[in-house]
């Protein structure tokens, strides 16, 4: 990869020459309503600290704001607040509905877009669309409450209220540019899109996270220097200054709870909402001495119709000398040009401008979604100066007292999901590796570190329930990162791989001991991240008739995990030959798991099995007593076994310095020929290659016949999570006198299961599609050009598996691409987004997508795993121009070179 100015900054950060990552977009979009801030008796996090309290109540564990930044430990924070003269409160944070208020669960209602960002955050840009009329808080709450009774009704969005009619809104753009690691220029540009002049109050705000109200930590201080600068003093942080030339006034209060407003008790004279009350109501709630722990610079201006207002600030070390420094506009332009060069070097030549825009905004969303996550479970359970409610010691996450989270983590969505999710994070790292290998490696290992991983080896799922089980993707993601680094730099980071394998061993041991309840290598799994894809709530522990559910995907994930561990050990064995023994161990473990896929057939005398020979699909099986009931739901669960695959070059292994692994496979082939035949075959493009897989050639063809059928799983925009066939033919089953069923819902969920904001019963989900694409390429590497399938089924077009993978990638990318009419499928029927050029190209990366038309659904800023579209665009560009960039993901890698971290 070309060494751009941004690459040089990454090198400086890696080698300790400059701490470029010290400041970044680590402020959450929402801290209220989180588990961390919940001290209620019943664990009702959304109600304990609601949006209406957020402006008045000091947070215990983090901060939030609009387009904000903080230092790595979130000691000092900066964000933008605004007022249009009509809202009942300042716009200090984005507004959205809680899980109970939204008709499909929690839902942010403000419109904001992450447009640009670099991995050192030397350049960042985001856009917020602020209505000029009074923000319709009551209308959004009331209408969505009315619609909640019928989940088939669409969500009532901000644009539906009419607040943007006549273009009466401001486009507010925040730009950040770093001169040095601790010298940051901030430009705020307000564009009046309306037909009339309109007032705006801008209040860029600097404050300290409250660390002093809960214990003995000393209280920091902000104060005014003259009329255009705010200075900081903190016992543990370097002194900083915020220069605000041209501000009308500097306003100060304390980041402390307004106990008088909330509980009628005496409290601070200038509380957290003091600036809000002063601006909106004229209250005497700002400190006339111009000092405190929260401060804002005020600009009150009239912006003419079609006109713009721009202000520039500078956050820098107290020793910087003050002012904006030399040529602030030139610095902004330079950092933008450097960002252009950085991203141009990461896309193959020939990538269309539209795809380049999509990829860049996807990367921007990934980088903006870094968040400081603070949660010390022991302290949280015990409470602070005020004792927590009784019974808390046995409440949520009480078995995870060792967790001491105080890290910057890539979030799924910093408003709807402002907490880590273990399997989401794995997908994030695959995208992050394209821009920041060091950060990606740290992130993929993070939840397996001792301050997160349970002593028994379990990885925490997410703050609502650390005990839940997510698919074990950490080693897969780590291998993706290592392969990408080796392909693009020629280095194999064996130090990273050793850490990955060591932590993975602990997790694998927990997985097989905990989730294999009967010791037969069939895995119950539980939740496994696919929310409502099952007929039953798999995380509840309840099954009809007190039965046991044998999950096709649970066993698949276990086999997948074993293969990833085997491949990691094989990579390390290139430089540490003793790892061949570990690789052989995981090969054998995979074989036993694969054999268990047929275990039910033996135990039930052929009456049930995970593989259904007649349908050519895998199904979950429910056992109640001596009865085995296949749950014939045609879903991603049916297809997932194809992802457990590895293609081995036996000739290369035999020719290596330590051919022990090849010898072990040869022994296994001789001694356990029947079992070996189930999982491994050499029928392909070369006899020296061995395919290790849960599915043989025949089963793969049959699975693909369903997966690539437009009447079943194949949409114009990727693979559906549930077959379209279930629209006309819903699955029904009766067990113990109770009826259960599942139907095709291509859009939002029609039930309240898992809060109602997630749906795996029809929509397209980017992460599992990417796993399927990856598996197709690995199968192709073995079978080669001779293995073709009809794609789509019924078209008469025959494709190799590599071509099918490219076709699926194109369909997923097409969700975001503008057609000849300029319309983007992601926007669905939203007229303003489809027709207004100012809205059409500022993209949102939704959680999942309509199974028929590709419209975005769910969390609007889940760039996390949906950011994988950037990887797909890169891969498609390399496929179209194989000579223009490093080899594709599965080409033969260069020789290993040990690399430290």
Residue ranges of each PLM-predicted region?
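Structured, charged N-terminal subsegments at the starts of enzyme catalytic cores
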Residues: 65-70, 78-81
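Acidic, mature catalytic/reactive cores of soluble proteins
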Residues: 1-56, 74-76, 83-901
